[in-house]
Amino acid sequence: SKQTDFQVREKLSIVATILAMKTFLGRNESIMWVPISLDEILRVTGAIGLPKDYLFTKDALKANGKPISDDLLMMGVDVTEATPRVYLYPIEIKFSQDDIHSDKGGIQVANTYKLFAERLYGDLNFVRSVYRVFFASQLLTNLDKMKANGMVPDTCYEKIEEIRAKLLNADFDLEIGLPIKQMGAASLVTFNSGPNAVETEIVENVPICHININTPNCLNLLKDTADELKIKSNS
């Protein structure tokens, strides 16, 4: 059915985005990246036990009338200094035949970034500490899943594993923005029939990196990756 086909393509676009982002964000030297479902974060925050005013669950945010992104969060960790540095890079993914959803997607991911800035960045207080530990635990959980599935190099896993206690004690610096400023504070990734393109634009006072990926190219990327994984598993 058309709906099922669209859902499959939507899921494939998430996988393709993760693959593309690992390469794209990899240009920031010394940062190891772990993909996390934003939907999962929004779903679980309600169970932390903080007052409702502090939560950024979907229901709480809908009540404020602010559309947010619930697709993907790339969390980066840099362990080159004594105090680890952590980066948050939210990503909204839009899959369509044309560019009709891009304006809405830019606003969604800009709102998500502003929410992180408000609840996580700045001087440490009790609420920010709780949230930072929660995000760190999500990073470590996803890293463990990736390790179990052979999707993360041993060296990368071991480096983050060494600072597990620091992460879970909020003993890290949460960095605002990436070393490469042109990548913006968040990203909108669109899949359509248009050409591949990258540009940074200001949406709601937030620098958003808009990446357009040609859909046939995306499917070829996935096929090449699947073939590579098959070769690895057979070797």
Regions found by a protein language model. Give the residues of each.
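Nuclease catalytic cores
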Residues: S1-T45, G105-G106, M183
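Active-site metal-binding core of divalent-cation-utilizing nuclease and nuclease-like domains
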Residues: V34-P84
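Phosphate/oxyanion-binding active-site loops and adjacent basic polyanion-contact surfaces
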Residues: F6-I14, L61-L72, H101-T112
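Extended hydrophobic secondary-structure segments that form protein cores and membrane-embedded regions
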Residues: P35-S37, Y89-I93, G184-N192
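Acidic, metal/cofactor-coordinating or nucleic-acid-engaging core segments within structured domains
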Residues: F24-S30, S96-A185
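Non-catalytic C-terminal interaction segments of nucleic acid-processing enzymes
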Residues: M146-S235
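Short acidic, S/G/P-rich loop/turn micro-motifs used as interaction or catalytic elements
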Residues: F95-I100, G194-V198
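Conserved catalytic cores of phosphodiester-cleaving nucleases, focusing on short active-site segments
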Residues: L72-G76, V86-Q97
